Amino acid sequence: MTVTASGGSSLARPQLYQTVPGSTIVQAEQQDRFPQQGELRELSSYFQSGLKRLAIAEIITRNSDTIVSRAANRIFVGGSPLAYIERPKVDPRNLRSAEEQRAREAKLGTVTFVESSGGGGFFSGLTAALGGAGAVRIPSGFRPINVARYGPRNMQKSLRDMSWFLRYITYAIVAGDPNILVVNVRGLREIIEKACSTPATLVALQDMRATSAGYFRNDPEAQQLVKDYFDVLIREFEAPTPSLKQRQRFAEDQQGLALPQSYANAAERRPKFVIKSTLSTVEKNEAIKAAYRQVFERDITRAYSQKVSDLESKVKNGEISTKEFIRRLGKSPLYRQQFHDRFVNSRVIELAFRHFLGRGISSAEEFTRYFDLLSAKGFAALIDALVDSQEYADYFGEETVPYLRGLGQEAQECRNWGVQQELFKYSAPFVKVPQFVTLFGEYKQPLLDQHPYGAGNDPLEIQFGAIFPSRTVNNRTNPAPFGKDTRRLLVSKGGVNNQVGSAAFQQSGTTPTKIFKLTQVAAGSSSIRSKSVGNPSIRQTESTTQAVIRAAYRQVFGRDLYEGQRLTVPEIKLENGEITVREFVRQIAKSETFRKLYWNNLYVVKAVEYIHRRLLGRPTTGRAEINAYFDISAKKGFYALVDAILDSPEYIAAFGEDTVPYERYITPKGLALRSVRGLEASEKVKASLRPAAGAQERRPEVGRR
């Protein structure tokens, strides 16, 4: 299977619903201004009512079971609906005593008044019929649902849905905006009709409204607030399911996509500006500033006191349309200086798509068409082609200022997801590399042999310490989509030869890896207790044991340790034969010095990769292997990771008990890093400067040129 590049996984947090503070601040931020007086008053009013909103939500939440059960008794017969309510587990420490609850309600003026389960008798029904606070209008076609026929599973789902409706009410009250009801309730009617009954659901919602409002009879303002949000809930439930928001296609190479209407309702509201002759001067100025922000990515009149000749007066007087105003801004010397002269043609096209169509390049074929146009006819022809396109006419027309068609505005393509999110950022003009073209080119080439979680997680394959290359490209926006079955290509190095290794690697004249193996000799005897096969061993004497210890330190730490950092107790035990080399490696790998150097200061993925190379002598091969180490590190910690590597069958087969770990495999990139091509070229240059054999070397004469 060929693994190619990915469209990117740029982190996106789509907005789930609107809130009063968020909507107000976003509107001011999008228009590059301070909040206006009306917006500040709205924020002030919202924050002043914050305690009341929290108290309302708390009372409804505390009595949610009663509210839901009363509504269920209205629409279900032949059983007890309360038995099917799924109650979440509540921490006893969070429960308040009844006295504290009554005291708080008395202080707030929200003492509970709830009707009995019998329904309140004749006068209660008369109040409902006259349209009081507890009025429930029975829709046509309503019939109570039999619990036995409906079934336990459907009962649980229905009561769960009623609890969700009530929860949405509390969320909307706290947020100060009913948008969360619009997003989550509109379109549910057709789904509920398949399992339940729409008239029954409407009766239940009205009963929940009446019961909830009854808890605030002493506070008319809170009661009206609750009723208003329930009215929005009922109105959105009755509304038909909205249609999908289709993305228009203007070429066969573009993706035809659809965005659910709920996503568009939840997204941040992006104002659309138009310039008409009937608008006031203030409105025209706001639209012109929006055009500057879209085309130049900033308000040039405010930030730099710059203007584009007399275009503003012409568009205000109706001499030119908004479309023509945008065209002339794109052809102005200022735009050419800012977004053409400093970039290569590929990046010029990418920025032009953002400024005039509000999106990124869709495909390589689309880029090729506009690149050919720019190369053949120049920059002005590119602007004309974008502004005169059918896409521009359908989205913006003659009067609308272009806007960014990003997340929530319309469906986004997956093949350019990451780079398009980057193009919409403020830092886009500072990126010189053509991101879209680079991505489309990577689609046609297999991925490089690199770390499955990004090339920046591979340390430089040198001896001294964990040095990782600095990455200028964010790994989240340029991921490596390796599958779980993809394995890295490793180059055999040292004393390991198998079907993956190549005999051509061991060339004549190269120095093989020196293997340190501690062979213990019985005292007073010449017999060897542990024989060495294939490689010379070091007998256990004081000098040779110190050589093994130094080799272990260099392999595990990458360098010799200072005297104060050495582990004297494990060294003595190794010299006395109390522990094996494997146990000695385990103890120095678990030392505080090693942990501080290669675990505490590194991300987990980098730490696991480096420790694996030091202890097992090779890089990790793929996601399956490194994910297993992630699981061990997360559940059992650092010491369990070291034990898992040293106790693995691979370690025992490769090194056994008495061999110091050594580098067995390296990556192709590491092999290229150690190449002697540069040294060979340097020697050739030096040889060319030496005098020929037998020639007499002359001293240069001073003063002659």
From Swiss-Prot:
All copies of domain PBS-linker, residue ranges: 253-433, 514-691
Chain positions recorded as (2R,3E)-phycocyanobilin binding sites: 196
GO cellular component: phycobilisome; plasma membrane-derived thylakoid membrane
Subcellular location: Cellular thylakoid membrane
Basic and acidic residues compositional bias, start-end: 696-705
Chain residue ranges for the region called Phycobilin-like 1: 18-76
Region (Disordered): 685-705
Post-translational modification: Contains one covalently linked bilin chromophore. This protein autochromophorylates.
GO terms of biological process kind: photosynthesis
EC class of the enzyme, as a word: lyase
Record GO terms (molecular function): lyase activity
Domain of life: Bacteria
EC number in record: 4.-.-.-
Subunit structure: Phycobilisomes of this organism are composed of a two cylinder core, from which six rods radiate. The core is mainly composed of allophycocyanin alpha and beta chains, and of three minor components: the allophycocyanin alpha-B chain, a 18.3 kDa polypeptide, and the anchor polypeptide L-CM.
Functional summary from the UniProt entry: This protein is postulated to act both as terminal energy acceptor (by its phycobilin-like domains) and as a linker polypeptide (by its repeats and arms) that stabilizes the phycobilisome core architecture. Has intrinsic bilin lyase activity.
UniProt family annotation: Belongs to the phycobilisome linker protein family.
Protein name: Phycobiliprotein ApcE
